Structure formats: structure tokens, C-alpha cells
Amino acid sequence: MKKVLFLLLCTALTGCSFHTISNVSQQTIDVHVRVSDWQYTNMIDNNYFRCVIDMPEITSHVFNQGEVQVYRVFNRNTADAFKHVLPDVFHQKEVLNGETFLYTTTVDCLYGIGWLEFNYRVSDFVYDNGNYGDFAPKAMDFSIVITKSY
């Protein structure tokens, strides 16, 4: 019993270690995506809109040891402004030509070294027939927070 207790005590005291990062800096970049910036992918069974931007701030160091957090900003520059962390999922109801559509819109992002891609998807592929104009994304604002650790 003493051996088991001794082994548990040794494991508990030496098994965990903490690495403290003492130098951290953050940078916030505001991005406005215009309606004309969204590109329709038109891929079979995976249709969505996307907007790719250059992000030289996402270096290999940030990619491997830092963090990138993206927020969608609503009502920017107003007293009612608020942010929502991506992914951003909203349930929608829309009536077009007397027909009711229930669907979900999702805004998310991908990033790599030097770039960031915003994606806008509508559930159930409601624009599979090529008539996606009514479901195209509007202009959107985003805040990108890049955290670097040294």
C-alpha cells in the first residue's frame, strides 16, 4: 500500500508541468466584406459563397504558436454594435413568390499562413437550381483578433 501511495504521490507531483507565456500581444483588424466580394463556388453538392482576403499578419509563427479568433460585427459604429464569435448560425424564414422557405445560414472562416477565407452557407442547398440571387449574402463586418506569443 505504501508503494502505491508513493507512486501516486510521485506521479501527481511530477506528472504535470506548466509553461507560462510571459509575452503576449494582440492585434485587431476590422474587415468589411462588400456584396461584390462574395464569390459563388457552384460546386456540385457543396454550394456556398466565399470571400478570400490576404492576411499577411497570419505568419507561420501565429499559425503554429498563436491564435486567430474571428467575430462577426453587427451594427458597426453604432450604439447598438455587438460581436458574435464565428461560426455564426441563424435560422431564417423567407417568403418568395408566395413560397415559404425555412433554412439556416452559417458564416464561418478558414485561415492559413497569409490568408483568411470567410464562408457563407445556406442550408438545404436552397440555391442549387442556380437561382441564388435571393439567398446571396449581404455586406458583412468582421473583427479578426490575432494573438502572438513570444
Features from the language model and the residues they span:
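Bacterial Sec-dependent N-terminal signal peptides
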Residues: 1-6, 15-35
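First exposed extracellular module after export/assembly in secreted or surface-exposed proteins
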Residues: 25-150
